Amino acid sequence: MTELRQRVAHEPVAPPEDKESESEAKVDGETASDSESRAESAPLPVSADDTPEVLNRALSNLSSRWKNWWVRGILTLAMIAFFFIIIYLGPMVLMIIVMCVQIKCFHEIITIGYNVYHSYDLPWFRTLSWYFLLCVNYFFYGETVTDYFFTLVQREEPLRILSKYHRFISFTLYLIGFCMFVLSLVKKHYRLQFYMFGWTHVTLLIVVTQSHLVIHNLFEGMIWFIVPISCVICNDIMAYMFGFFFGRTPLIKLSPKKTWEGFIGGFFATVVFGLLLSYVMSGYRCFVCPVEYNNDTNSFTVDCEPSDLFRLQEYNIPGVIQSVIGWKTVRMYPFQIHSIALSTFASLIGPFGGFFASGFKRAFKIKDFANTIPGHGGIMDRFDCQYLMATFVNVYIASFIRGPNPSKLIQQFLTLRPDQQLHIFNTLRSHLIDKGMLTSTTEDE
């Protein structure tokens, strides 16, 4: 007994802080594991039949397969008609529509996370998500306004100040949101709150960044906006039609209804469609000219002298093809060659944006992101491929098309001090004289 007392007396006793931290870690670990298991069993949003009653009655005698065909077809035509209307209304309306689509897509993705974890009553989750959306939009679109509305910004004192300190203001706004998130952390929900913090930021990266690139593409000329979007739409429709009538071979497990027949048929149909649409649009200045802001009329203008990219040129046809079609040359716009790259990406790589979205939906056991469009799902279901396409088009323009922009260089020049402007003027004049574009007589005058 004496021995036992001595052994107990000599055993080290763990400090209370360690015990407390261990129990805290245990509680946190149990909470995280419980969160994951509860998330698996939590009720998830499912797709509902929101087909208009008129269509339901008209198609009641058809099988579910053909009913879905007609519902998708009719509503697709309606969306295409709406697309034509907003194109007719001009670039300003297009930009507003892009912003609305961005907000709706963000709402659909954030709502999925909220529905999965709604039972945990996470503090400030939705408020902070929308606040971060506001911050990121302010950062991206503030840069755009400064680039494309420079004269207007410099004319108005408040806008000039906001433009000058734009990045600092953006960073400050984000820091406020970051501090709010840290202050909202709750002991029993640490891991889950960081999950949702990452969820929000990945959503912002996918949705806001891509929509920002869409608007940049639009400013390069409406043709860079319309052709890529139309190619994705065409590929989606033609892949569905080829798959519906000829589909036999499954393409990918993530989307069991996708077939190789639809994938290949959609590719060839999209390339042909891209060539035809590019040929038609390249002949109109309103589509090919960059969208610029006119300070005199306070409106957008799309009038310019078309670049060589949109002027008909004659190309020699390879000898092998000459023997088949009997033509030696063909007249086409250089942009049509670029349209082949755009349509190829839209049909071969673009669908992987849809496959990515399918994997996301399978992970959360939902059929669609929302029920906004009957037969199609949510807005995000229609734009999952468009966002990937927007990034490609922006990179393609920057790599192969865009050169130095004289108007932007002049804008930057005008912001310099007078002595800096004079120095650049003298340097440029000396350079032009050396090149033989100015004479010494001109210099003396």
Swiss-Prot record:
Record key words, sorted: Endoplasmic reticulum, Lipid biosynthesis, Lipid metabolism, Membrane, Nucleotidyltransferase, Phospholipid biosynthesis, Phospholipid metabolism, Phosphoprotein, Transferase, Transmembrane, Transmembrane helix
EC number: 2.7.7.41
GO cellular component, one term: mitochondrial inner membrane
Group of enzyme by EC: transferase
Residues with the Phosphoserine modification: 21, 33, 35, 37
Catalytic activity from the UniProt record: a 1,2-diacyl-sn-glycero-3-phosphate + CTP + H(+) = a CDP-1,2-diacyl-sn-glycerol + diphosphate; 1-octadecanoyl-2-(5Z,8Z,11Z,14Z-eicosatetraenoyl)-sn-glycero-3-phosphate + CTP + H(+) = 1-octadecanoyl-2-(5Z,8Z,11Z,14Z-eicosatetraenoyl)-sn-glycero-3-cytidine-5'-diphosphate + diphosphate; 1-octadecanoyl-2-(9Z,12Z-octadecadienoyl)-sn-glycero-3-phosphate + CTP + H(+) = 1-octadecanoyl-2-(9Z,12Z-octadecadienoyl)-sn-glycero-3-cytidine-5'-diphosphate + diphosphate; 1-hexadecanoyl-2-(5Z,8Z,11Z,14Z-eicosatetraenoyl)-sn-glycero-3-phosphate + CTP + H(+) = 1-hexadecanoyl-2-(5Z,8Z,11Z,14Z-eicosatetraenoyl)-sn-glycero-3-cytidine-5'-diphosphate + diphosphate
Topology of this chain in the membrane: Multi-pass membrane protein
Quaternary context: Homodimer.
Lineage, opening ranks: Eukaryota, Metazoa, Chordata, Craniata, Vertebrata
Main location: endoplasmic reticulum
Ranges annotated as spanning the membrane: 79-99, 132-152, 166-186, 213-233, 262-282, 340-360
Pfam family, one: CTP_transf_1
Record family assignment: Belongs to the CDS family.
Biased composition (Basic and acidic residues): 1-39
Activity regulation remarks: Inhibited by its anionic phospholipid end products, with phosphatidylinositol-(4,5)- bisphosphate (PIP2) showing the strongest inhibition. Inhibition is also acyl chain specific, with 1-stearoyl-2-arachidonoyl-snphosphatidylinositol showing the strongest inhibition.
Cited function: Catalyzes the conversion of phosphatidic acid (PA) to CDP-diacylglycerol (CDP-DAG), an essential intermediate in the synthesis of phosphatidylglycerol, cardiolipin and phosphatidylinositol. Exhibits specificity for the nature of the acyl chains at the sn-1 and sn-2 positions in the substrate, PA and the preferred acyl chain composition is 1-stearoyl-2-arachidonoyl-sn-phosphatidic acid. Plays an important role in regulating the growth and maturation of lipid droplets which are storage organelles at the center of lipid and energy homeostasis.
GO biological process, one term: lipid droplet formation
Record region (Disordered): 1-49
InterPro entries documented for this protein: PC_trans, PC_Trfase_euk
Protein name (record): Phosphatidate cytidylyltransferase 2
Residue positions, PTM Phosphothreonine: 31, 51
PANTHER family: PHOSPHATIDATE CYTIDYLYLTRANSFERASE, PHOSPHATIDATE CYTIDYLYLTRANSFERASE 2
Subcellular location: Endoplasmic reticulum membrane
Source superkingdom: Eukaryota
